[in-house]
């Protein structure tokens, strides 16, 4: 007689089956992407759809004397040619920016940067549209050009923004010059100045963080379709923040939000480039409303690099006051911020310079003062958070370079200087001198682990030997050791200090369990490659005990998703991830009531075990979450409404503060300027780790972009405002050939105020990577007394450094 018994899986076995938090779950979205079955904006094809293209200015600053569109309109296949004159009667010739400025949709009377939009041609296909734009005749009167932000603030500098020349008070106080945008100050100026006045050592440098540009695989694009019968507009687009775009379109067009349906399908990368609104979106909407047919706009790569939102262009005069033995007493920083022709920064309204006031970094100092002046120039507008959280990259670059130059002046090892000044674990939560309250951290532990792993002291000994060999003429190669210890600020953000256009920067999650136990969750964020469909499901799997494979995540549809502020600045996990956990716990609390009813016990007699509620002391008496889901729809307890679903709008109590220790070992040939990264080690602490494999992918991607920015990327202009490098022939994008090998590591310091302890990680490798590369280059040349070497550190610039130092024979 065979007796078969069923062995109940252990808690560990059931937890492993869930593929919840901490599991290296493969990205579920990659199945469609790797098979070429993604659904992108350019895949949207509608009956009768037309195509739009822009006539763009060849001048950086010029008055428009006339625009003749007659030849273009006469071309067969052309349906409309829109200019500012056509938009004015609709009050659509200007649009609000996320920074509170107004930006011309189509240039009105004069152009302010090269390739600015002048007219919008609508034709039967993109080829006819391209032909038509060549037939539009624009008569320009060139005006003096300003591309240097310092010259733009000189008393006799030409006026750029004639549309606001009489508005000398902005959202952040008085404008002290007609090209001035804002002056923003924070910190104890009096106390900081007093500390500097009596400091034993003052280290002062000017660090320029050059203009760069996010380079997503997919450019910005949209399809607008107006249903005149219903009075409803559907807008597909590459939107990192679909609900924000819906609000902006409503404000511009006058259409109520319930009549606007915004859909962000699959997006091929964003990196901050797709947060704001662009002229292409507005013109496509207007053309669809006027013509009554769908209109598609897709920008090309040149347009993307030269006209959509740039990043950086910060000129930072940074000072540290210290004792002779290396104790930092104060920081003073003044920034001249080049915002281009319009202030279109994607920053929270109350922070015109973003979170630049994180610039005191990971270091304990009593006082600090920061002042930022924004200025208009004849460049494309922007100032987006390119792989960072609102100017944090600039802030970290400033403090990490300043630490290095202070160490050189003190003749002190820069690692020792950092350790001497770290915020200590027992000081958390730590109130930084410029206002942020750091949540948690163990900086000494992370630094020690990193130094031990790379063999820091052995590397310094090797470097010393190579320097002596170089002086003896035995080698033409120098060695640099770059260090970056960064603290980032992400998770924007708390309603008390973060909003965009007046909308608080909460985020949201709506979770519904079906009768059979499967789940659908809708989020207010929008992935552009971050892997949300995988990681949000893992959070829910852990919280509710339902396998991640039974959970579907939806984003990007404003008709179905709860209102959210989108994905950028590493905010998805700190905000929407928290909302997901809280919504799941609401469901779990209701499920516990149902379990108590079914098991005929009090709720307090139950305990949670991976995927079930069981009676305390009687583990054989339990109800799984799937059983409870079925019961919730078919036999709920009396006076309890059916179903298991919840929504949460999460307003974070604070930001989260991921941190990391990065080391770069670099070898540079002084005769050619060619720099080779021998080793790059990145230790990140992002709090609770949801999916280690996705974290590693994020770190690899961020470091690759950091390598590109530090070692070659730059959007340059000549004196006439001509863009130099608006293609990938000139704008450096590293391939697998150039990209170094990345070595990743971690510590775990959970955020005490976040529901699952997570902090965010997507931006950290870029934030920490850029100064690490730059510090490696500067460290290599330091023994030759080269002084600060500005980025980007391409071979031509490093060859010039060697030439200036007299190293070439």
Curated annotation (Swiss-Prot):
Its EC number is 1.2.5.3. It catalyses: CO + a quinone + H2O = a quinol + CO2. It is an enzyme of class 1 (oxidoreductase). Mo-molybdopterin cytosine dinucleotide binds at residue 763. Gene3D superfamilies: Aldehyde oxidase/xanthine dehydrogenase, a/b hammerhead, Aldehyde oxidase/xanthine dehydrogenase, molybdopterin binding domain. Keywords: Copper, Metal-binding, Molybdenum, Oxidoreductase, Plasmid. GO terms for molecular function: anaerobic carbon-monoxide dehydrogenase activity; carbon-monoxide oxygenase activity; copper ion binding; iron ion binding; molybdenum ion binding. Binds 1 Cu(+) ion per subunit. Dimer of heterotrimers. Each heterotrimer consists of a large, a medium and a small subunit. This is Carbon monoxide dehydrogenase large chain. It comes from Afipia carboxidovorans (strain ATCC 49405 / DSM 1227 / KCTC 32145 / OM5). The lineage of its organism: Bacteria, Pseudomonadati, Pseudomonadota, Alphaproteobacteria, Hyphomicrobiales. The gene is coxL.
